[in-house]
Amino acid sequence: MKVLVINPGSTSTKVAIYENERCIFLETYEHSPEELAKCETLMDQEPLRRNCILSALEKAGFKIEDFDAIAARGGILPPLESGTYVVDERMVNYLKHESPVKHVSNLACVIAYELANGKSLSTPPIPFQSTRWCLRRGFLAFPR
């Protein structure tokens, strides 16, 4: 299984590729204050960071269709039961418009959803809250 991992930070975007449990690519892209200042809102950074990820994949010789899944670092979501969730349109809308905290981790799921949109991944994008996560059967829908 090949997994793309997206981890946006306040001034960087980290991209990793895992094949089964082994990291085969890891890159950190630093964003200058000037680059980030061009974005009026946090969500305005989405294209900038998405393009960084696509550049990283190109550098590593991959395209989105090569992945079985995309894992996205967290996001400020409402309290949820422990488990694995699918990043769907409702979750993306929540992170963009309803999340009580405008945090850079909200971008990860939005970017993952955009990257996966229209692609035939065997597993839809999933959020994770730590570096140790697992895929499970029976994905839960994001609650309202």
Where are the regions that the model predicts?
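Short glycine-rich, Thr/Ser-proximal phosphate-binding strand/loop in the N-terminal lobe
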Residues: 3-44
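Long, well-ordered hydrophobic secondary-structure segments characteristic of membrane-embedded
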Residues: 72, 108-111
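A structural motif corresponding to the C-terminal end of an alpha-helix
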Residues: 110-123
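Short beta-strand-loop/turn "lid" adjacent to the catalytic site in phosphate-handling enzymes
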Residues: 57-104, 121, 129-143
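Conserved active-site "lid/cap" helical segment
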Residues: 29-71
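Short secondary-structure capping/turn segments at boundaries of alpha-helices and beta-strands
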Residues: 2-4, 59-60
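Glycine-rich anion/phosphate-binding loops
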Residues: 46-52, 99-107
